[in-house]
């Protein structure tokens, strides 16, 4: 037990959990002056997917975000397949439909839930690194990953090799996902035009043909 007047050392430098040591523990402080380090010719940009880590990561020496993945926001914050939000009536499982209704009840519409959550997540990342560029990759889930989202099984084909299948740019203009991609575009438009975070730049992933880029 610690008594009044006891000397202890409290350490928060050993991971997620703090430690308390009896007595005064000797330690060495190493200070590095980052301003004195020469800057490389190549711009160093970070990868990020979780908005919760954005404001911590921004303090690392960096030239912006080279890849901001939106899959974490969709899977952890939205949790619902975009097409299930556009067409909730097509979700056949009553329990899944009820869970979608519960998650979206505070939004004007299910589709607005997607736009709000995605724009707030991307906006947090963009604000943390402002005014440095933040390159946001549009969704690049594979079909099996999309199917694992709430309501996703109703909208995704089963593929022998999802890694090379219906993903990236090929999805965006396809009738099976065009309305879902429109929600992504609405969210990123809100980040740039309503939030004013014009440091956001878009990346279209897995573009296999020039025609796919033109269609997008």
Positions of the model-derived regions?
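Glycine-rich, flexible loop/turn motifs
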Residues: 16-17, 160
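Conformationally flexible catalytic loops at phosphate/diphosphate-handling active centers
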Residues: 1-4
């Amino acid at each position: 037990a610690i008594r009044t007047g006891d000397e202890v050392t409290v350490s928060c430098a050993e991971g997620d959990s703090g430690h308390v040591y009896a007595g005064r523990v000797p330690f060495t402080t190493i200070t590095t002056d980052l301003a004195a380090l020469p800057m490389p010719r190549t711009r160093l940009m970070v990868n990020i997917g979780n908005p919760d880590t954005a404001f911590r990561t921004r303090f690392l020496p960096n030239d912006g975000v080279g890849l901001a993945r939106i899959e974490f926001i969709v899977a952890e914050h939205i949790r619902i397949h975009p097409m299930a939000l556009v067409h909730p009536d097509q979700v056949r499982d009553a329990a899944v439909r009820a869970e979608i209704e519960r998650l979206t009840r505070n939004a004007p519409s299910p589709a607005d839930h997607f736009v709000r959550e995605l724009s707030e997540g991307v906006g947090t990342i963009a604000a943390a690194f402002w005014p440095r560029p933040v390159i946001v990759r549009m969704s690049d889930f594979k079909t099996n990953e999309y199917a694992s989202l709430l309501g996703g099984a109703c909208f995704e084909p089963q593929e022998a090799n999802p890694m090379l299948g219906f993903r990236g740019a090929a999805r965006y203009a396809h009738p099976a996902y065009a309305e879902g991609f429109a929600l992504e575009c609405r969210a990123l438009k809100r980040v740039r035009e309503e939030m004013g975070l014009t440091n956001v730049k878009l990346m279209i992933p897995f573009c296999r043909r020039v025609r796919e880029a033109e269609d997008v």
